[in-house]
Each structure stands twice: as C-alpha cells, then as structure tokens.
Amino acid sequence: MNGKKLYISDVTLRDGMHAIRHQYSLENVRHIAKALDDARVDSIEVAHGDGLQGSSFNYGFGAHSDLEWIEAAADVVKHAKIATLLLPGIGTIHDLKNAWQAGARVVRVATHCTEADVSAQHIQYARELGMDTVGFLMMSHMTTPENLAKQAKLMEGYGATCIYVVDSGGAMNMSDIRDRFRALKAELKPETQTGMHAHHNLSLGVANSIAAVEEGCDRIDASLAGMGAGAGNAPLEVFIAAADKLGWQHGTDLYALMDAADDLVRPLQDRPVRVDRETLALGYAGVYSSFLRHCETAAARYGLSAVDILVELGKRRMVGGQEDMIVDVALDLRNNK
C-alpha cells in the first residue's frame, strides 16, 4: 500500500438495486446516501441496477427514474461524489448529460470484457463533461488476463483514467485476480488507476478485493451488507474491518458503516443477500449475478430448479444483456424433462 489512501466506491444504491428488483424509494436513497456520506466513503453510485435507462421489460422496471434517484442522493451528500453506471446500448450520451445535470460527477462506462470498443463515444463525452471517467470491464473471468489488459488499454486510449476488473459472476479466486491486475499494470500507463468490483458468490468478495489492493489496485467497490446482485458484492463494512486489520488507510468510519448496513439496508431485503444454493450456483457456473432473480421467477413459473437454469446458462456462456434467454433456457429444460 505504501501509505496511500484507498478510494472507497459504494455501490449499494446501484448494484444493490438488483437485490430488491430496482425498488428503492426516494426516502431509502436519501437515508442510505446520507449514512454513507457521514461515514466518509469517496463515491456513491446511484442508478437502476443495469445502469442509466436500465428500467425496461428486459431488466425490470424501477420504482423511480435514474434522475430522481440521483437527485435524491445528490441532495443529501456533502463529501462523497455521486457516481452512476452507463452500459453503451442501454444508456446514451444524452442520458449521461442528464445524469451530470442531476448531480452525478463520476461515471463508470461498462461493457462486456471483450467489447471495450463500444465505449469510445461515451468515455470521450464523459471526459468532455468533466466527469471522473472509469472503464468497467464486466464478466472479467470470461477472457484471459492478457486479453483483458488489451481491452483495458482501449478504454484508457478513449480517455478513461481508471479501469476496473469486474467479477460480475463472482466466479474468480485470488490467483485469477492477481493475474488480471498484473496484466493490467503491465499494459496501462503508470498514472492510470485500477479498480476492483467483486461479487460474493463463492464467499471471496473481500479476499479478492484484498488481493487486488496487494497488486496495486486503487479503488474498491463494495456495498453495505453486501447489497447487490447474486450473493451480493464485497460487504463494505467487512472489507473496511479487514483493511483496518491490515493497516490500510481508507478514511471511513467502520462503526457508522456497520450501523447503516444493519439498520438501513438489511431490513429492505425481501430475499436474503447471501451465499445459498442458487447464488453459489451463479459463482460456480460463472453466470452474471443479476440473472438470479430472473431465474428464480422463471423456475417458479415453469416448475424447474433455479440451479438447473443457472448451470445451463453457464454452459451456454450467456452474458449480461441476455436476460431474455433465461426463459428460452427454462422452456428447453422443461421440454427436455
């Protein structure tokens, strides 16, 4: 660590949307954002779980618009920057401008790990707006460290000043993480930051985040009580406790985060965010974590096991954006019974 301060990026109000089907109220957003700000996290990501304009039949309709959620959070924060997520093809540069006007100052432009080339316009426009612009390579387990580094280099070339390794399936272990950060560090400019976005499907969210920091990672994504898709993200309060034990500087208030996790976030979970049969299957099969709730719905509708659907999706190497294939797979499994 060499005494540097970690950048703590909270994702409770974006990835956490998946855990409750994108149904945060504006009051929920204000209370959680204020608690995070009081605990001195560096940024608070706010959007539909699938990013700006993710509210749709395919991904699930949100209780509010992205702009309403962003404005609600921006109204109560004094220290943290408001961040948002944009997936090219779902959100547009017009949506990004509106998010900026609503108060977002950080954007993570997210693509599948082999499709960085679709992010060029969005990254360039974000830089023109003056936003802190981050490249976000989802499902990073699905390509080699060397290929991932080449994709990261593309995003850097478009103007991203930080590139994330994103374990969307919660499928990687510490060696996988180390290999990817070493590859990125060898390819990127020294001044380009790196970030880690973990999921906890194999219970390795915190361990993988620690491994990333040990390899020089600058920014860590985490969420209160792990609130996120699948078994959730690296639980923020747990990561901070572990970072304290390691003597790392993070600038946040551990006990305030612990209180926010248990008092504000955990009570909102209509399905526990934890490692269980279904979420473990996500990590084991390497499936996009936000498929969980969609798979459980399809399993109930067609009289199937959600695990069977998840395993088949993994075999077919489905990726984020292919949520419509969940029903196809379910029908295939039912017909083959």
From Swiss-Prot:
GO terms for biological process: 3-phenylpropionate catabolic process; L-leucine biosynthetic process. Its EC number is 4.1.3.39. NCBIfam families: 4OH_2_O_val_ald, PRK08195.1. Catalyzes the retro-aldol cleavage of 4-hydroxy-2-oxopentanoate to pyruvate and acetaldehyde. Is involved in the meta-cleavage pathway for the degradation of aromatic compounds. The keyword Metal-binding applies. Keywords: Aromatic hydrocarbons catabolism, Lyase, Manganese, Metal-binding. The keyword Metal-binding applies. This is 4-hydroxy-2-oxovalerate aldolase. InterPro entries: 2-IPM_HCS-like (IPR050073), 4OH_2_O-val_aldolase (IPR017629), Aldolase_TIM (IPR013785), DmpG_comm (IPR012425), DRE_TIM_HOA (IPR035685), PYR_CT (IPR000891). The gene is mhpE.
